[in-house]
Amino acid sequence: MMSITLENLAKLGASMIVDAEGMMSSSLESIAKKCAESGAKLYVKNAHKLMSIALERIAKAGKGNVTFDFSNDKKK
């Protein structure tokens, strides 16, 4: 699914679960911003695949509407 469609859904107030693997961090940031504007929630699976600066930008854009899932992080 194209991220522009996900952005439109978030703008309409649709909460969603997305997989960070294979998505650009800029797309996740845009979706998070739309979620913040509409009050929707964004749940990001495989968040350990993202760089820390990307996580910070997504979190800032989401203004408390983003949940990161690090549970699949097998690194020790």
Label the predicted regions.
Residues 1-76:
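General marker for long, soluble alpha-helical cores
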